């Protein structure tokens, strides 16, 4: 079942760390063997995730303004308005990305970042 939810503490810490451009704090929110999938690319483990965060979040000074939080059978779906110094060619003025988080034992074990488009039916 899907319903509106509050951010779990680790997810609030994660968003705050992204907005603070703090790669150490970002990496600390993930389990050692976590998976991030961003733009159809996989990053496994905290060291790979740290490199991804350093280059693509901190390096591009990405910020996230959360617009919606949903619980879906224990996973958390977070939609947010993204901004930063990244290449915005062919992107909408307001970039909304959907983050699909799985949290276990107080750590993020998976994060999938998706730019969804509305279904035509």
Spans of features found by a protein language model:
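A short gly/proline-enriched turn/hairpin at secondary-structure junctions
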Residues: 33-44
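Short, low-complexity N-terminal intrinsically disordered segments enriched in polar/charged residues
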Residues: 1-29, 120
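Glycine-centered loop/turn positions within well-structured domains
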Residues: 24, 32, 109
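Short beta-edge strand/loop motif at the mouth of beta-sheet-based domains
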Residues: 42-52
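A beta-strand edge to alpha-helix "cap/lid" segment located at domain peripheries
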Residues: 1-3, 50-121
